[in-house]
C-alpha cells in the first residue's frame, strides 16, 4: 500500500486494539505521563507511524501523533483501566468486589499494586484529587471526565510551545508547531 491515509486508518483499526490487549492489567505502570513512551508496545507503535510518514526515528513523538491523527496508546490504556475499575466495582460478583476493595487497601503498603499505579496516574490529571477520592471511597470514576483530563494533558505539550519562536528555541517540536 502506498496510501498513508489508508495505512493509518488500518493501524487505528487493527494495531491499536492489538496494543491494548490486556492493558487494563499490565498497562497501569505506563499510565503516568512521564512513562507513557517507556512501553515496548508504544515504541513499536511509534516506529510504525514514523515508518508510514517516512520520518527519521528522531522525529518528535508528539508531532508524529499529531500528523497521523493518533493518540498515544496511554490514552486507550487509561480508558480501559477506568472501565475495568468501574466494571469490577459495580460487578454483581461479591468476590470481585472484595478483590477490588482488598487491592484498594493493599495500595497503602505496596506502591506497585494495580490500584496504587492507577491512583498515581489519576493524580496527574486536572481533576486528579476528585478521581483519587472516588477510587478510595469505592465510587465510580467518570470516564468522560478522565478522558477530557487526558486530552487536556496531551494538549498541554502543544500549549507549552505555542508562540515560541523556532529561531530562538532549538526543540524540534517548536519548529513543527510553528
Question: Could you describe each region identified by the protein language model?
Answer:
Residues 1-107:
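Non-catalytic, peripheral interaction segments enriched in hydrophobic/basic residues
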Residues 25-32, 88-178:
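Charged boundary/loop elements
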